[in-house]
Structure formats: structure tokens, C-alpha cells
């Protein structure tokens, strides 16, 4: 994997810097590195593809070295270099696609394609110029079963989940109380509602709670907490739990009271925040517990009082909500990230070449299913294909 990264880094630099008119002295170190790459690769044959509709291609390396010059690089020099660069880039692209198309239930972090396994041989270690990539560093650690640490912004840690629970219901569905939520990606939105606005609740207060368990622990997370859940702030018709009917939800938004968010790790509370909104920090957690209250306003103007009558029918439904959004965090496991294209790159290659469903990944690389059942085998394979996708993205946009 380190060799693949070094090849890509060298080729990217060569493509960007070996241009007509450039002083040779400005790129002499790069050209020496480029020539070392050619010397190492010459005389070797590789084969890629042969899975799904990814065609089999054979690769033979027999290229001349780039020479020295006292002055600027001329058109002939650059044209010779370009021919070599484009062949190498095409080779790297196909190695990456071949690797992204394969999976294994055992030791899925190791190279799976014939070409990448060959590049892992001792003879190619001379190409290992640079492994400063975060993905390469963590792939090395994972390969040795040591602790990794990926920094994610907008991590896709929450499987998609949208539902409701009713703490009070009846066949007519005209006096309900409960919670509804939407968890997806890096965001949780949860709302507590009471059609009667806590009319008969103790002290006119309804208590709500929402607990979310993560599939992998996060550390040093920067989080935004807001006293609102905008996705539940407009009227809607909702299917009943048994699917036999529908019920009407017409929210009137109140501010939540006694808001508390707890971050837990293995059942132990690590951080707690009470009535604090905006940016908060969570040190280490695998579970989030949100609790908040809906309080019937003790004093109301006539207009507000008309919204929350003392008896049915309740045409407006008192609602309070919270939004919790993970802005950035560190995770020991590789995740999809809304700010990165790695999952999209891997999925696109597998779809384009009709890669058959294997023993590890779900059909279509369905992220919700993948993260919901995030097994060690999936983690290993995802670590590998994301590392390869990060390498490919240097050369292929």
C-alpha cells in the first residue's frame, strides 16, 4: 500500500511540475525520484481486472530514463515524460479499481488484488518515498493491529433512523404524547410533543428522553447542540405504528426546559451538559442520552391560551425539540464522511463495473446497513478500500 501511495504521489508531482519551460534545476530531485521509480518497475509484468465487468489488462514496464539538461525542459523532453506518466497513471488507476472491487472475510485489511500483492514485494520497497497520508499511516497501524485514529468532519456515524414512540395514545389519535426523531449521518433531531400541552401532567411538565448508541466510539468530538428540531416544526400526516391509519401532527414550538445531554462510554458517564447550547465538547463516548422537558406556560396571553385549551379538541400540538450535530471527531475505525468522496468513489467503481455482491459488503454499499452491522471484517475491508480510494483520488478526480 505504501508503494502504491508513493507511486501516485510521484506521478502527481511529475504531472504537475514537469512542464515545458521549467528549469531542470527546479525539478532535478523529482526527476531522480521518477527515474528510480522507472528502474524499479522496468522488467515487471502485472495483470489487473477480471472481476465483474472490470476488463483484464496486462501491464509491461520497459521505459527509458529521463535525462539531464542544463537549461529549461523543452517540448520533446516533456512529451517523453508525459508518455511515461500517462501509462503509469493508467496502471495505478486500474490497480486501485481492482482493489476496490475485492473483499475478503479474513484479513480484509491486506491487499486482495494480484497486482497490489505483487507491489508489496521486497523489490519494490525502493519506491517507498513518502507515506505521510493519514490513511496510509492508519492502514499501517490497522495492519499491525495497533490503535488507529482518523479525524472526521461530519462523520456518518448514525445509521438512518426515523420513527416515533407514543407514551399516550388512543384509537382516535386525537390526544397523543410522545417523541419522534430522525438520526442520520452526523446529526440527531428529536422532538417531544403533547397534544394537551402537559395539561394533566405532574406540575404541568412532560419529561422526554432519547438515547442513541453509536456503532463505534468517538473521541475529542466538537458538537453543536441547539434547542430546536426544525425537521419537526411543520404539520405532517404520520402513519400509525400498526399501519392501519394515519394521524395529524400540527406542532406549535416551545423552548425545551431542563435540557441535559450525557455522553457515556461502556455505560459510564464521561461528560454531562445541562442547559448549555452552542458548541460543546465530548471527550470519549459510545452512547448519547438526551433528556428535556415540555412545560405548560404558567402565564399565557389570550392568543397563546387559545392555542392550548383546557379540553379537547386539541388542534395545535405543543412541541419541544433538540438538534445535536457532530462537527468533527476522532474515531479508531474508518467511517464515511460527508466532507470526503471516498465512499462515493468506491461505490461508483463497484456499480460501474457490476461487481458482484461478496461476503462482506452489502448490496450497493448501503451505508446504513453497513454501519448498523459494522463487523471487524467490514472494518478491515473498508479500511483497505478507503485507503486505496484516497490514493486514487490524488490522480483521478
Curated annotation (Swiss-Prot):
Positions bound to Zn(2+): 153
One Pfam family hit: Rota_Capsid_VP6
Record localization: Virion
Record-listed Ca(2+) binding positions: 266, 286
Cellular component terms per the entry's GO annotation: viral envelope; viral intermediate capsid
SUPFAM superfamilies assigned: A virus capsid protein alpha-helical domain, Viral protein domain
Matches recorded under InterPro entries: Capsid_hemagglutn, Rotavirus_A/C_VP6, Virus_capsid_a-hlx_vir
Function of the protein: Intermediate capsid protein that self assembles to form an icosahedral capsid with a T=13 symmetry, which consists of 230 trimers of VP6, with channels at each of its five-fold vertices. This capsid constitutes the middle concentric layer of the viral mature particle. The innermost VP2 capsid and the intermediate VP6 capsid remain intact following cell entry to protect the dsRNA from degradation and to prevent unfavorable antiviral responses in the host cell during all the replication cycle of the virus.
Similarity-based family: Belongs to the rotavirus VP6 family.
Name of the protein in its database record: Intermediate capsid protein VP6
Source taxonomy: Viruses, Riboviria, Orthornavirae, Duplornaviricota, Resentoviricetes
